Amino acid sequence: MDNLIKDMRENLNSYSFKVVSDLVKELDVNRDNKAQIKELADLLKEDKRKNVSSLGNRLEKNLNNLIKEEERVKNMYLFDKSFGDYKYVAGVDEVGRGPLAGPIVSAAVILDSSDLDDIILYINDSKKLSEHKREELSEIIKEKALSYSISMCDSKEIDEKGIGYCNNHVFIKACEGLSIKPDLVLSDGYLIKNFNGENKHVIKGDTKSACIACASIIAKVYRDNIMKEYHKKYPQYDFEKNVGYGTKTHVDALKEVGPTEIHRMSFLKNIL
């Protein structure tokens, strides 16, 4: 990067717009090269050619977006630290409460909040992220988390015990499955009933808390992958796309073919 800046300082006027544009497109704006990106953006903005100058403005915008993202995520980590002097704070969230088929899945995650220069960028409510971004982040989270755990209840358990019970049960099991005992558990939406530990609930926690957002992401990816496997066995229900939710294609297939072993019969009373 330093060599590129040196080269640009010496030869920018001799480079065509296309050459400069191609070089800029190849740049990865990240936390490790912010100073160099700022220097290069300023250099391009000073160029008398409007199109080259606009590349500098674009690069500066990308840098500013990165800085804003760092600040947003840093605040999520600080939110987790704001509850007191707890060493290990876990976030727990679930996915799959509302679908007609498949399990309800919960994940619990403990992050390292001691180094705010090593945060996981782009974490958010899993529903706000693209499938590709969720999958990418899920691997990063599992690699960087101090501990994580996943728990689920299948459709049979949901029919036998109810979705409310199963929702609470997977929260407890995910927390109990952590290799590190959390000093505090932040749960998305509501308190965990009959949980043997310190617990606080956070409304819309997956947009406020770093550890809840991470739990949301790995739970979503885990469940989506289960439903993709079920799609291979039951392709007519389109589980690959609807992941068990009641889309028109899914409901039409239910009416035409009937339910499968993974359908929640207690959810189908108004459909069949």
Swiss-Prot record:
Query: PROSITE patterns from the xrefs?
Result: RNASE_H_2
Please name the GO terms that the record assigns under molecular function. Answer: manganese ion binding; RNA binding; RNA-DNA hybrid ribonuclease activity
Q: What enzyme class is recorded for this protein?
A: hydrolase
Q: Which GO terms describe its biological process?
A: DNA replication, removal of RNA primer; mismatch repair
Task: List UniProt keywords, sorted A-Z.
Answer: Cytoplasm, Endonuclease, Hydrolase, Manganese, Metal-binding, Nuclease
Which SUPFAM superfamilies does this entry report, sorted A to Z?
Ribonuclease H-like (SSF53098)
Q: Which HAMAP family match?
A: RNase_HII_B (MF_00052_B)
Role of this protein: Endonuclease that specifically degrades the RNA of RNA-DNA hybrids.
Name the record gives this protein:
Ribonuclease HII
Tell me which species this is from: Clostridium perfringens (strain ATCC 13124 / DSM 756 / JCM 1290 / NCIMB 6125 / NCTC 8237 / Type A)
State the encoding gene.
rnhB
